[in-house]
Amino acid sequence: MSAMQVDVVYALPERQYLRTVKLEEGSTVEQAIVASGLLELRHDIDLQVNKVGIYSRAAKLADVVQDGDRVEIYRPLIADPKELRRQRAERSKSKP
């Protein structure tokens, strides 16, 4: 099996983490995240809670990554999008 490169990213409002890792073909999203070292660096990442994706598309930890993929670790939502839309709609109705 040959080696491939995969980027693993995790973004916070104040800082972004980007790690490039070398993996064997057939490696999974979870293996890429573990190899990146981000789990040791950021203890707030919980793979049972945080969703993950590849190039902005939802992925599972067991999905196989391809050479050049960008694995993304997403932060949990802090607000309900439906509730925010409802509040904006109410505010726009009350404006003259």
UniProtKB/Swiss-Prot annotation:
Pfam families: Ub-RnfH (PF03658). Gene3D superfamilies: RnfH-like. It comes from the Bacteria. Belongs to the UPF0125 (RnfH) family. This is Protein RnfH. The gene is rnfH.
